[in-house]
């Protein structure tokens, strides 16, 4: 039977519940425990697919095509298991399911209420999401005290009552603010947060106290006394410069031992040697690489969370420190490409809407004409095709029908039909709903023999995750190829364009993909496409007049992906 660890948060949002949950899962996994994670989001949206990145941050896409919370990306990066649509659900999904049941008459004419119907549905979703895991770590989104979180908190309270005592554990993450004028950490917000949680009927077994400095012993004792939590279970969640240090930080304070004791789990000792090697590689780079990430959501970098982490992973596996410069594409439209001077590589990520598109195209033109390594992802590939069509293939005014429906050269057009991972035919039109109607999830791609893409992946067939409505218009591929652009990967079956590249006689490293490789990058394994991108940037930096990217005069020997972390 599955045992449950429930993770809640108090005082303020964005304290890092997802990182804490993922770190605990990583430690338990090294102890031989089969673990999974769930994220419960209290908002009424069915999923975050149509939410603004400025409000929600990144939308993480799972292998089975679910648009989910960005915390699922952290989960996949910290443990070996893959998340599915069952690992993330929202208030919207719960109410939608209950209302459908009511319409079918499943409640036999009874009055449908939050308790028991909504809470029962939440418990059902938790059990289904846990699957056959030994331990399911369940993160409750939001903050204790939020009205929308109450049904979720009531549901997990009921589970603690209904299950044996040793089958549940509650972890509460709070903030210990430091008041400069007083010169001390303040515990009162934590006391009140736990008080509010206890009023709901939940007594935390562990407190994770987020702070920017050490927690004095007397303050720890004070927190334990006033929250009814054992002193050894009051654990400091110290601010660190890398999230990949958190597993060791929590393990050193015996969090995993406390949880295993509460859940009555017998497990081998934790082995965090891989995580320690990873952190060592992160802290001992041999070069610095400057990457320009040109996007429209740069004011909230959480919008590109998986992407920034994938670049960090590539840095780990190439012994490079990655400095990411977030560049607003609209600023390029206004002020030109001067902000890209000194960059070792340029990356244009995915995005939606017309705003900032021409600035991204200008950045791509700058990368191509100056032979700077370029990686385009999703929209970044589509705009690379548009730039090449305009400036090399003689199609002046070429555009995407997403932004310019009347363009004379619609080199990017709506994907009308394709087959899902399960082989089901999917058909879309311009009038289709926005939510959940894109080409989503893992899709098989065939790599062209002799292409740079095939050399990078070392395979003729890959599966990568997608999230898009528009695609390269096959009608214009012959003209693009005649001008010099190569279609280096296509989808299995439909022959949709999946990757483009330029011959290395024209450009040393110019690669773009319709899919999102960042969703499958992990710190332990990295990702071949990002590693190759960073290696290309390192070569460019070495050839630059100043070579300012070098940490030492002795250039390290290049190595293959994954050589440093076993």
UniProtKB/Swiss-Prot annotation:
One of its GO terms (molecular function) is ATP binding. ATP binds at residues 14-19, 71. SUPFAM superfamilies: Class I glutamine amidotransferase-like (SSF52317), P-loop containing nucleoside triphosphate hydrolases (SSF52540). CTP binds at residues 13, 146-148, 186-191, 222. Gene3D superfamilies: 3.40.50.880, P-loop containing nucleotide triphosphate hydrolases (3.40.50.300). InterPro entries: Class_I_gatase-like, CTP_synthase, CTP_synthase_N, GATASE, GATase1_CTP_Synthase, P-loop_NTPase. Pathway: Pyrimidine metabolism; CTP biosynthesis via de novo pathway; CTP from UDP: step 2/2. Residues 1-265 are annotated as: Amidoligase domain. Mg(2+) binds at residues 71, 139. CDD domains: CTPS_N (cd03113), GATase1_CTP_Synthase (cd01746). L-glutamine binds at residues 351, 379-382, 402, 469. UTP binds at residues 13, 186-191, 222. Its EC number is 6.3.4.2. Residues 545-566 are annotated as: Disordered. The active site is at 378 (nucleophile), 516, 518. It is an enzyme of class 6 (ligase). The keyword Transferase does not apply. Keywords: ATP-binding, Glutamine amidotransferase, Ligase, Magnesium, Metal-binding, Nucleotide-binding, Pyrimidine biosynthesis. Allosterically activated by GTP, when glutamine is the substrate; GTP has no effect on the reaction when ammonia is the substrate. The allosteric effector GTP functions by stabilizing the protein conformation that binds the tetrahedral intermediate(s) formed during glutamine hydrolysis. Inhibited by the product CTP, via allosteric rather than competitive inhibition. It holds the Pfam family CTP_synth_N. GO terms for biological process: 'de novo' CTP biosynthetic process; pyrimidine nucleobase biosynthetic process. CTPSs have evolved a hybrid strategy for distinguishing between UTP and CTP. The overlapping regions of the product feedback inhibitory and substrate sites recognize a common feature in both compounds, the triphosphate moiety. To differentiate isosteric substrate and product pyrimidine rings, an additional pocket far from the expected kinase/ligase catalytic site, specifically recognizes the cytosine and ribose portions of the product inhibitor. Catalyzes the ATP-dependent amination of UTP to CTP with either L-glutamine or ammonia as the source of nitrogen. Regulates intracellular CTP levels through interactions with the four ribonucleotide triphosphates. Belongs to the CTP synthase family. Homotetramer. This is CTP synthase. It comes from Nitrosospira multiformis (strain ATCC 25196 / NCIMB 11849 / C 71). The lineage of its organism: Bacteria, Pseudomonadati, Pseudomonadota, Betaproteobacteria, Nitrosomonadales.
């Amino acid at each position: 039977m599955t045992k449950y660890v429930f993770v809640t948060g108090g005082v303020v949002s964005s304290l890092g519940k997802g990182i804490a949950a993922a770190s605990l899962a990583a430690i338990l996994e090294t102890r031989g425990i089969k673990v999974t994670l769930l994220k419960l989001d209290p908002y009424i949206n069915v999923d975050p697919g149509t939410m603004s990145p400025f409000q929600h941050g990144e939308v993480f896409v799972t292998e089975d095509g679910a648009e989910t919370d960005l915390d699922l990306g952290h989960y996949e990066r910290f443990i070996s298991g893959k998340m599915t649509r069952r690992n993330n659900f929202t208030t919207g999904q719960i109410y939608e399911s209950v209302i459908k049941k009511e319409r079918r008459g499943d409640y036999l004419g009874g009055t449908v209420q939050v308790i028991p119907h909504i809470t029962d549905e939440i418990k059902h979703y938790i059990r289904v999401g846990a699957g056959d895991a030994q331990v399911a770590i369940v993160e409750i989104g939001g903050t204790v005290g939020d009205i929308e979180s109450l049904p979720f908190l009531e549901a997990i309270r009921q589970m603690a009552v209904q299950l044996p005592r040793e089958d549940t554990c509650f972890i509460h993450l709070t903030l210990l603010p430091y008041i400069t004028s007083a010169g001390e950490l303040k515990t009162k917000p934590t006391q009140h947060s736990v008080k509010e949680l206890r009023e709901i009927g939940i007594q935390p077994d562990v407190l994770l106290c987020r702070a920017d400095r050490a927690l004095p012993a007397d303050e720890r004792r004070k927190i334990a006394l006033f929250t009814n939590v054992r002193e050894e279970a009051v654990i400091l969640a110290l601010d660190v410069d890398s999230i990949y240090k958190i597993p060791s930080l929590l393990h050193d304070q015996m969090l995993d031992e406390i949880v295993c004791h509460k859940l009555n789990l017998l497990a081998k000792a934790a082995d965090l040697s891989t995580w320690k090697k990873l952190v060592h590689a992160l802290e001992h780079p041999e070069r610095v690489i400057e990457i320009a990430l040109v996007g429209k959501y740069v004011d909230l970098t959480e919008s590109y969370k998986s992407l920034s982490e994938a670049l960090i992973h590539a840095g780990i596996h190439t012994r490079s420190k990655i400095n990411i410069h977030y560049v607003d594409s609209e600023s390029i439209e206004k002020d030109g490409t001067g902000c890209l001077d000194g960059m070792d590589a340029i990356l244009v990520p995915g995005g939606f809407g017309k705003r900032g598109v021409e600035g991204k195209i200008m950045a791509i033109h700058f990368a191509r004409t100056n032979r700077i390594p370029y990686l385009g992802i999703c929209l970044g590939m589509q705009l690379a095709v548009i730039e090449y069509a305009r400036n090399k293939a003689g199609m002046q005014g070429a555009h995407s029908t997403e932004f310019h429906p009347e363009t004379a050269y619609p080199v990017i057009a709506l994907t009308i039909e394709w087959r899902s991972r399960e082989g089901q035919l999917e058909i879309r039109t311009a009038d289709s709903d926005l939510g959940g109607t894109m080409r989503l999830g893992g899709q098989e791609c065939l790599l062209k023999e002799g292409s740079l893409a095939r050399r990078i992946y070392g395979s003729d067939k890959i599966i990568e995750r997608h999230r898009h409505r528009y695609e390269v218009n096959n009608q214009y591929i012959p003209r693009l190829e005649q001008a010099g652009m190569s279609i280096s990967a296509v989808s299995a079956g439909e022959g949709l364009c999946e990757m483009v590249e330029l011959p290395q006689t024209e450009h040393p490293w110019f690669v773009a993909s319709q899919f999102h490789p960042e969703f499958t990058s992990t710190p332990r394994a990295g990702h071949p496409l990002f590693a190759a991108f960073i290696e290309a940037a390192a070569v460019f930096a070495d050839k630059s007049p100043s070579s300012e990217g070098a940490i030492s005069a002795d250039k390290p020997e290049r190595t293959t992906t994954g050589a440093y972390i076993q």
